[in-house]
């Protein structure tokens, strides 16, 4: 076994909800820890999947996802040949790390952020360099620039950032990109950007065409509600797009995932309603935390990161009362997914009771 792998701590996914519910002896358990879409999936997706031609199940899927490629390109206003599809964004993180990292190369992140960036850097024998966020949990771009050396081959920017939910402006990101050496890749993860107010003005989707070292990633798991289908994509400059297609596993995205993603794109009203409901409930959470005197980060995503005395005890209290939220991301802090209006009301009442 490679030494770089033997010492790793694995990414630990959540237990199946039914398993955890049975262990706790609960009649109901609501998961607000994985940033899933609480409003489900577009009915058009269900129809499309049910109508899929099952006689094709013994055939390989369209390896290039041509129909979906054209739909995404039209939706985003980009060159269809710049798109590389992946099994969720997890596979894309693997592909990027495998492509651009060699042993002892360094990967730079603004911390805290998504743990898989560092995990896959270490799998490739690389080293993770973390620059702490500013006091308001925004990216310290000046600190990142100071940390860039010839050994740094990749810089990850998650926007909105997971777990903080903070959003960086397109102007700030492009100004940073312009200072980064062209041989250092800047990887922008926009998994949650659909939830961001004014997302069209925030997205870096057009930057890869201008800067060969920029990659922008998107997923269908969040606002589109397709987490179970495992489908995402990245947009590359033409300098790298064809090469990335050779790195990608053949037939990586199955036909049902492609069908589901196409149907999801064809129902923009579902996404619009999801985003609107999330914004309404997110604002209620911020008002609740203000009223309770709780410190939290300004979020442009479908989750909120907050600081709480006895955070571990609060999370334990909540899960034993039917609500699972995320722990372990920063000492004394918790992350909760913005749920439905009813779930949010119930959860807020439980927090009041715990505080009392």
UniProtKB/Swiss-Prot annotation:
PANTHER family: HISTIDINOL-PHOSPHATE AMINOTRANSFERASE (PTHR43643:SF6), HISTIDINOL-PHOSPHATE AMINOTRANSFERASE 2 (PTHR43643). Its cofactor is pyridoxal 5'-phosphate. This is Histidinol-phosphate aminotransferase. The keyword S-adenosyl-L-methionine does not apply. GO terms for biological process: L-histidine biosynthetic process. Pathway: Amino-acid biosynthesis; L-histidine biosynthesis; L-histidine from 5-phospho-alpha-D-ribose 1-diphosphate: step 7/9. InterPro entries: Aminotransferase_I/II_large, HisP_aminotrans, HistidinolP_aminotransfase, PyrdxlP-dep_Trfase, PyrdxlP-dep_Trfase_major, PyrdxlP-dep_Trfase_small. The modification N6-(pyridoxal phosphate)lysine is found at residue 222. Keywords: Amino-acid biosynthesis, Aminotransferase, Histidine biosynthesis, Pyridoxal phosphate, Transferase. One of its GO terms (molecular function) is pyridoxal phosphate binding. CDD domains: AAT_like (cd00609). The keyword Transferase applies. Transmembrane segments: none annotated. Homodimer. SUPFAM superfamilies: PLP-dependent transferases (SSF53383). The lineage of its organism: Bacteria, Bacillati, Bacillota, Bacilli, Lactobacillales. Its EC number is 2.6.1.9. It catalyses: L-histidinol phosphate + 2-oxoglutarate = 3-(imidazol-4-yl)-2-oxopropyl phosphate + L-glutamate. Belongs to the class-II pyridoxal-phosphate-dependent aminotransferase family. Histidinol-phosphate aminotransferase subfamily.
């Amino acid at each position: 076994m490679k030494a770089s792998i033997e010492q790793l701590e694995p990414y630990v996914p959540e237990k199946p909800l039914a398993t955890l519910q049975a262990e706790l002896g609960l009649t109901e358990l609501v998961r607000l820890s994985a940033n899933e879409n609480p409003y489900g999936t577009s009915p058009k997706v269900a129809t499309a999947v049910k109508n899929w031609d099952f006689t094709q199940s013994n055939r390989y899927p369209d390896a290039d996802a041509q129909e979906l490629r054209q739909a995404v390109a039209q939706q985003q206003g980009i060159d269809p040949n710049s798109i590389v599809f992946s099994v969720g964004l997890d596979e894309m993180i693997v592909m990027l790390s495998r492509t651009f990292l060699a042993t002892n190369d360094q990967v730079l992140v603004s911390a805290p952020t998504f743990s898989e960036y560092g995990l896959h850097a270490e799998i490739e024998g690389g080293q993770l360099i973390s620059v702490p966020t500013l006091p308001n949990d925004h990216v310290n771009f000046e600190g990142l620039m100071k940390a860039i050396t010839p050994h740094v081959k990749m810089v990850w920017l998650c926007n909105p950032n997971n777990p903080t939910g903070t959003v960086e402006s397109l102007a700030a990101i492009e100004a940073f990109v312009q200072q980064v050496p062209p041989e250092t890749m800047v990887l922008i993860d926009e998994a949650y950007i659909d939830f961001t107010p004014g997302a069209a003005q925030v997205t870096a989707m057009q930057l890869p065409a201008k800067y060969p070292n920029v990659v922008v990633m998107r997923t269908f798991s969040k606002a589109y509600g397709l987490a179970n289908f495992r489908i995402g994509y990245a947009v590359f400059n033409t300098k790298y797009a064809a090469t990335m297609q050779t790195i990608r596993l053949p037939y990586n995205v199955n036909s049902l995932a492609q069908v589901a993603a196409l149907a999801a794109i064809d129902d923009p009203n579902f996404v619009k309603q999801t985003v609107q409901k999330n914004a309404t409930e997110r604002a209620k959470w911020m008002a609740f935390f203000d009223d309770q005197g709780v410190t939290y980060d300004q979020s442009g995503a479908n989750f909120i990161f907050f600081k709480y005395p006895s955070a571990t005890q609060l999370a334990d209290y909540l899960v034993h009362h039917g609500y699972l939220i995320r722990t372990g991301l920063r000492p004394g802090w918790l992350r909760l997914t913005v749920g439905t209006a009813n779930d949010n009301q119930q959860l807020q009442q439980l927090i009041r009771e715990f505080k009392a």
